[in-house]
Regions:
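C-terminal transmembrane helix and the adjacent membrane-cytosol boundary/short C-terminal tail
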Residues: 98-112, 116-117, 185-220
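Transmembrane-helix boundary motif in ABC transporter permease subunits
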Residues: 9-40, 53-55, 103-105, 110, ...
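Membrane-helix interface segments
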Residues: 28-36, 64-65, 80, 110, ...
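Periplasmic/extracellular loop-to-transmembrane helix junction in inner-membrane transport proteins
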Residues: 1-11, 24-33, 74, 176-185
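Interhelical loop and adjacent transmembrane-helix boundary motif
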Residues: 157-207
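Transmembrane alpha-helices
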Residues: 97-100, 104, 108, 122-155
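Membrane-interfacial helix termini and adjacent extracytoplasmic/periplasmic loops
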Residues: 52-89, 159-164
Length: 220
């Protein structure tokens, strides 16, 4: 249940950030864009343990951001399920941004320009034309982020530790069972559950994406 909670919240909290970053990278040009693109994709190449450590020194109770959040808002990420969600968000960020960005780049901008010439505001064009046409990529990004969050281990254990009932997701529970003699069957059971959930989420993602593309007339 905790794994589904963490993997469910992570894509939802990440979605607005992912849409904004994808739009910035797909539709704008400015000095430093390459740097932002590299930072967004950095979690793909950095070891998850490094990401967890960076989160610990920045967002932990004594971190330069986490300390301020705790003093001002009473919000703490370290050693809590919220921290596990944050770790999954960082790890899944490039997958979501990449999916949405590719979908945005495939949108025919002539449709947006036609709407603008008819008097539609940029915001209305975005919500009535751009966003609906990008939905297949958004759905794919959400499901990929969900599946990636289910399998997250390194950043989570580095940032929020392995606390049963609070931060112990399926991968962390598997690690605990593997370290405990005689618990191989429990680890195998969790492995089977993880595979089933991951395959199911990827299947649903593909099905929803194809259905949305047919409804939008993007496929023949």
């Amino acid at each position: 249940a905790l794994s589904l909670k963490v993997a469910g919240y992570a894509p939802l909290w990440l979605l607005p950030i992912g849409i904004v970053l994808a739009w910035v990278l797909a539709r704008t040009s400015f000095i430093g864009k390459g740097l932002i693109d590299s930072l967004v994709h950095l979690p793909l190449v950095l070891p998850p343990v490094v990401i967890g450590y960076l989160l610990l020194i920045s967002m932990g109770r004594q971190g330069f951001i986490g300390q301020w959040l705790y003093q001002v808002f009473g919000l703490s990420f370290s050693f809590s399920w919220r921290g596990a969600v944050l770790a999954c968000m960082v790890i899944a960020l490039p997958l979501m941004v990449r999916s949405i960005r590719l979908s945005l780049e495939s949108v025919d901008q002539k449709l947006e320009q036609a709407a603008r010439t008819l008097g539609a505001s940029p915001m209305r064009v975005f919500f009535t034309i751009t966003l609906p046409l990008t939905l297949p990529g958004i759905l794919t990004g959400v499901m990929l982020a969900f599946a990636r969050s289910l399998g997250e281990f390194g950043a989570t254990i580095s940032f929020v530790s392995n606390i049963p009932g609070e931060t112990q997701t399926i991968p962390l529970a598997m690690f605990t069972f593997l370290e405990t003699p005689g618990s191989e069957m429990e680890a195998a059971r969790l492995c089977a559950i993880s595979i089933a959930i991951a395959l199911g989420s990827l299947f649903i993602s593909e099905w929803l994406s194809r259905r949305m593309q047919r409804r939008l007339g993007l496929t023949s």
